Regions:
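Short, hydrophobic/aliphatic alpha-helical segments
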Residues: 2-5, 189, 381-385
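Core alpha/beta nucleotide-donor-binding catalytic domains of modification enzymes
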Residues: 2-157, 167-171, 176
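A structural signal for well-ordered alpha-helical segments within the folded catalytic domains
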Residues: 18, 39, 43, 143, ...
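Short, small-residue-rich loop/turn micro-motifs
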Residues: 122-126, 220, 349, 379-380
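Short Gly/aromatic-enriched secondary-structure transition segments
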Residues: 48, 61, 231-233, 360-362
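Class I S-adenosyl-L-methionine
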Residues: 105-112, 125-323
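C-terminal target-recognition/interaction regions appended to catalytic cores
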Residues: 267-415
Length: 415
């Protein structure tokens, strides 16, 4: 592009806990506004917004004191930051009814300036393979959220947009949904493309997780761009040795949301990725409690995993089987691969930890909030507001930060 700029601005729609946004901020982009309907996720973004402002103004100690405090008064933390920044995190569902008000808040924040980029993707449950079986897609309003996304494109006319979603969006209604989205976007004046292999995988961006996502990138027709080629990162890092080893071993139900010291020195992976980023303590290393029945199953699952097999729920001793419909629970219990990368972390982690069993048999538990956040490549000073369950849900729904940063760097080159 002909105009050289130092900073590019973006709006993050359906922002969740801010994983995508964090990656773009790391790549030098400036957020104008975040829009998210979940209150806990909004509070998380407000706290992260405070972190970035305090860091830029050399006042990180205020943020660190907040992390260390046992009472955590987030409103007090936010008071240290210009009010308009906190107000730029808009806690609203995006709908026909709320659009005028959302636009008004963003316009005030923009103060006549342009928006260079819109990022974000509507909640993925609607397009996910699982979600589809449950509901008649036509009547689910979430399937029409892309129309509101297009309204933001029409109003703010950014140079580019990045639309993130689950692989299920490709096959939803035999591809009809995707073509509807493409058509609407083209009518708004944009060229649009998906990756040559249909999706990108987080593990190619240095994330220790096998997570496929469809990243749709669009640009104004006159810009004459094409879908970028992403560099993939080859590495042999492993979950247990490189991602979890410095955290204190915990048993079922142990841990705290508050600050605790690291148990061991950092690792090369944690340094390279800036996950463990300079603090001498970590928060939210807390595990949910499970009953004895589940814990016995965890032990069996880990033994089988170590022998190269996955646990089949139906083959457990009868006394341990609590669900009559064993077919739908075949893969209910899954161990995180300690000697490789994790399987995909999803929001269901908030319901129970059975799908994310810690690979160390001695600890016999599901993974902690902080371990889940690390699998999603969130830095250790990223604090998730709300309850333990709320934190798990935010993490499961997020875009991994390292993946977001890799995408953001390419988008910046294109701009």
């Amino acid at each position: 592009m002909d105009k050289k700029k130092d900073t590019f601005t973006f709006i993050d729609l359906f922002a969740g806990a801010g994983g995508l946004s964090e990656g773009f901020i790391r790549a030098g982009f400036n957020p104008v506004a975040h829009v998210e309907m979940n209150k806990d996720a909004c509070d998380t973004i407000k706290t992260r917004t405070a972190y970035h402002w305090l860091k830029d103004n050399k006042k990180t100690s205020i943020y660190n004191d907040y992390l260390k405090s046992e009472t955590k008064n987030k409103e007090e933390l936010w008071k240290n930051v210009p009010e308009h920044l906190i107000n730029s995190v808009i806690n609203k569902e995006i709908s026909e009814k709320t659009l005028p008000e959302i636009f008004k808040t963003i316009d005030k924040e923009l103060n006549g300036n342009e928006v260079d980029l819109i990022i974000g993707g509507p909640p993925c449950q609607a397009y996910s393979i699982v979600g589809r079986a449950r509901k008649d897609m036509e009547s689910d309003p979430r399937n029409h959220l892309y129309k509101h996304y297009v309204k933001f494109l029409e109003k703010y006319k950014p140079m580019m947009f990045v639309f993130e979603n689950v692989p299920g969006i490709l096959s939803a209604k035999n591809g009809e949904y995707l073509s509807k989205i493409f058509k609407a976007v083209k009518n708004a004046g944009y060229e649009v493309s998906i990756p040559p292999k249909n999706h990108l995988n987080a593990k190619d961006f240095g994330v220790l997780q096998d997570r496929k996502r469809v990243i749709i990138i669009g640009w104004k027709k006159e810009l004459n761009l094409k879908y970028p080629e992403f560099d993939t990162s080859e590495h042999n890092f492993q979950i247990l040795k490189d991602l979890f080893s410095d955290l204190k071993p915990l048993k079922n139900g142990q841990g705290t949301l508050n600050a605790v010291e690291y148990a061991k020195p950092t690792t090369e992976y944690l340094k390279q990725t800036n996950i463990r980023n300079g603090l001498d303590f970590v928060t939210q290393h807390i595990v949910r409690p499970n009953n004895d029945n589940d814990l016995e199953i965890y032990q069996i699952a880990i033994d089988q995993w170590n022998n190269g097999k996955r646990l089949n729920y139906a083959e457990l001793p009868k006394r341990l089987i609590k669900h009559s419909n064993t077919d739908s629970f075949v893969n209910r219990f899954q161990v995180v691969n300690g000697k490789g990368v994790s399987h995909t972390v999803v929001a269901h982690i908030a319901m129970d930890g059975h799908y994310y069993i810690h690979p160390d048999k001695k600890q016999n538990r599901s993974i902690s909030v902080r371990e889940a956040a690390r699998i999603q490549s969130f830095p250790d000073d990223y604090f998730f507001e709300g309850s333990r369950t709320a934190a798990f849900k935010q993490i499961g729904n997020a875009v991994p930060v390292l993946m977001a940063e890799g995408i953001a760097k390419k988008v910046r080159e294109m701009l």
